[in-house]
Amino acid sequence: MPIGVPKVPFRSPGEGDTSWVDIYNRLYRERLFFLGQEVDTEISNQLISLMIYLSIEKDTKDLYLFINSPGGWVISGMAIYDTMQFVRPDVQTICMGLAASIASFILVGGEITKRIAFPHARVMIHQPASSFYEAQTGEFILEAEELLKLRETITRVYVQRTGKPIWVVSEDMERDVFMSATEAQAHGIVDLVAVQ
């Protein structure tokens, strides 16, 4: 039986009355975001708007993005990554379950030295995929070209942010590569493994 979204007390600075807000709004006010689902346009736009709003509100206080996601739409994930690079505050990324596919790309996009994985977290990288079987021949070729460009971009970002040679990243992206938190740290995707 679903419990819904819990309400928690919140008092704005300078106000005497406490109001009840849903837990996500309370966490947003503390600059904490959660990517706990498949990446799509809706969650991407929500996270982007929150990052931009809070960076305008106070551009010197870090933002924290907790990730437990199986991945999702590449372009939506790249939009989150680009926003993380664009906003002035550092964005700390924390993998707390699974960061797979484009979610691992978002994880690696956190501020270098501020990317963390919980001890039992898993990270998976691979090449971008598509649904070619639904396309006509002409569409198939155009989609293949676009997919190749996306793969090159993603590979370049992993190389830049992990410090690994391009041949290592390219080889790893050929198939699904699952890593433990310590393996992800050795691979340069995260900087720290949280202590139990």
From Swiss-Prot:
Pfam families the record matches: CLP_protease (PF00574)
GO biological process: protein quality control for misfolded or incompletely synthesized proteins
Active-site residues from the entry: 101, 126
Residues making up the signal peptide according to the UniProt record: none
Gene3D superfamilies linked to this entry: 2-enoyl-CoA Hydratase, Chain A, domain 1
Molecular function as annotated in GO: ATP-dependent peptidase activity; ATPase binding; serine-type endopeptidase activity
Keyword annotations: Chloroplast, Hydrolase, Plastid, Protease, Serine protease
UniProt-listed Enzyme Commission number(s): 3.4.21.92
Places the protein is found: Plastid, Chloroplast stroma
PROSITE patterns named among the record's database cross-references: CLP_PROTEASE_HIS
Recorded superkingdom: Eukaryota
GO CC, alphabetical: chloroplast stroma; endopeptidase Clp complex
Reaction(s) this enzyme catalyzes, per UniProt: Hydrolysis of proteins to small peptides in the presence of ATP and magnesium. alpha-casein is the usual test substrate. In the absence of ATP, only oligopeptides shorter than five residues are hydrolyzed (such as succinyl-Leu-Tyr-|-NHMec, and Leu-Tyr-Leu-|-Tyr-Trp, in which cleavage of the -Tyr-|-Leu- and -Tyr-|-Trp bonds also occurs)
Functional description taken from the UniProt entry: Cleaves peptides in various proteins in a process that requires ATP hydrolysis. Has a chymotrypsin-like activity. Plays a major role in the degradation of misfolded proteins.
PANTHER family recorded: ATP-DEPENDENT CLP PROTEASE PROTEOLYTIC SUBUNIT, CHLOROPLASTIC ATP-DEPENDENT CLP PROTEASE PROTEOLYTIC SUBUNIT 1
Family indicated by similarity: Belongs to the peptidase S14 family.
Summary of subunit composition and partner proteins: Component of the chloroplastic Clp protease core complex.
Protein name as catalogued: ATP-dependent Clp protease proteolytic subunit
Organism: Capsella bursa-pastoris
